[in-house]
């Protein structure tokens, strides 16, 4: 796939310097590695459908995706480079988004920590016990009382359900698997200016959708640490997606038995069924692809729809 990139006030240069993407600027926040969204759609990099938009392929060749139902391609895959803190934010569920955001999908997402600085933390959840306490904390700017920060390290995996207050802190790079939605409600943005003006906040919507009380951390921290070698391991299966991780040393194989399988190479290089792949590559293995033979030293994060 040919990715889509975004420039953000919190972005940096790792997407170019570390992942090798040819994109200018020192504020590159996101690589949309697999995307078929009105705000950005990838094009096919090579092969039979070279140059076509993923969104068009989804509409015209649904057989490649196991005849999966749905008006829009269901998932969106990003690499996010947070040089600075992202806003404290929350996403709506499908019902709220459909009613208030012109029929959009809601946004469930999950994060695989690709890299982070020592002693890094994420904002996951909040400390309000009741909705009244939440409103008081938000309306009076009691952010240190409100937000819940957790330490994280490379290799951690975190699930972010709709309604979860969250933020990626500076110095963290993640691979994000999410519903195909671009709806974000900002709760707090550190009073930063963008083009000389504060960025828009969405206090009413945020208070509408934030889950109170917050889910326990055990519901969010799904997996942590090193994985087994040469084995496609499931990290999570939820309502919208399944996510897998594999660390390949020398060679490995598995059967692509899903309607389709999205693959992101997040470390190293090698070959997949004889085709060269490297860090930063994103691709889709279509329905009935069959056996996947991997050679080299590389790390993959893969995903598909829940069945």
What do these predicted regions represent?
Residues 1-129, 191-218, 243, 302:
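Transition-metal
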Residues 72, 80-85, 116-119, 164-184, ...:
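Ligand-binding loop in jelly-roll beta-barrel domains
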Residues 100-101, 122-125, 136, 169-172, ...:
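A short secondary-structure junction signal
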Residues 119-153, 256-278:
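A short beta-strand-loop-beta hairpin characteristic of the jelly-roll/cupin
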Residues 185-251, 257:
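C-terminal amphipathic alpha-helical segment
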Residues 246, 268, 280, 300:
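Hydrophobic, well-ordered secondary-structure elements that form the walls
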């Amino acid at each position: 796939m040919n990715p889509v990139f975004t420039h953000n006030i919190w972005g940096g240069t790792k997407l170019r310097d570390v992942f090798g993407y040819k994109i200018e600027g020192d504020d590159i926040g996101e690589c949309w590695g697999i995307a078929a969204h009105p705000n950005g759609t990838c094009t096919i990099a090579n092969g039979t459908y070279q140059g076509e938009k993923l969104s068009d392929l989804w509409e015209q060749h649904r057989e490649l995706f196991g005849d999966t139902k749905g008006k829009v391609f269901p998932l969106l895959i990003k690499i996010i480079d947070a040089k600075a803190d992202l806003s404290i934010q929350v996403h709506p569920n499908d019902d709220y988004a459909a009613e208030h955001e012109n029929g959009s999908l809601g946004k469930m997402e999950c994060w695989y920590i690709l890299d982070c600085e020592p002693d890094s933390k994420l904002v996951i959840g909040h400390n309000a016990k009741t909705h009244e306490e939440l409103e008081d904390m938000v309306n009076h700017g009691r952010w240190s009382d409100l937000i819940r920060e957790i330490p994280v390290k490379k290799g951690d995996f975190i699930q972010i359900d709709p309604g979860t207050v969250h933020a990626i802190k500076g110095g963290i790079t993640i691979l994000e698997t999410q519903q195909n939605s671009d709806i974000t409600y900002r709760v707090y943005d550190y009073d930063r200016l963008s083009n000389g003006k504060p960025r828009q906040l969405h206090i009413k919507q945020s208070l509408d959708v934030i889950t109170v009380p917050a889910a326990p951390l055990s519901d969010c921290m799904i997996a942590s640490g090193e994985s087994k070698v040469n084995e496609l391991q499931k990290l999570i299966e939820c309502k919208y997606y399944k996510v897998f991780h594999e660390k390949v040393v020398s060679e490995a194989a598995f059967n692509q038995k899903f309607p389709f399988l999205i693959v992101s190479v997040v470390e190293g290089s090698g070959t997949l069924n004889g085709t060269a792949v490297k860090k930063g590559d994103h691709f889709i293995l279509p329905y009935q692809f069959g056996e996947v033979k991997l050679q080299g030293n590389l790390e993959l994060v893969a995903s598909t729809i829940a069945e």
